Amino acid sequence: AGDIIGVFDPGIFSIGDTICSPGHKVQFRGIPTFAPEHFALVRQKDTMKRKQFIKGTSQIAQEGAIQIFQELDAGMEEVIVGVVGVLQFDVLKYRLQNEYNCDIIMETLPYEFIRWIVNDDIDPKTLDLASDTKKIQDLKGNHLLLFTSYWSINWALEHNKGLELAEFGTN
């Protein structure tokens, strides 16, 4: 019992937002965030194009074409971009060049698996992880781990009592 409408959005709404009458409380389970399968470290070539880089990557991520991650305690100077298919890297590069006038440097990363840390009470900085595992966060502050193999996932679960990992995130 609802309508689907088109709304002009000046950047206020995100995919999955619900608009309803004031006073109505509506609660949905989050839309699953699907796990990307390919990762790259991305930064702008010209440091003077930082605003264009941030605006462009944020906009493209908001559209759902890419997911943006950061290393813990890192800024937006360089980000880890996750995609489902490698062609999305080409789309990112093209759009940043042509729509935002921002050339980028992209380095493919060896990670194949990403997992969301379910436990809110676990500090990811204290986890005992294999050397090929990277601790990251998404733009909403959720903590995640990047792995190169199933072996590394099992290592993390075996060496960190109570750690719960999810294959999908929720918004």
Residue spans of the language-model regions?
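Structural and coupling elements of P-loop NTPases
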Residues: A1-N171
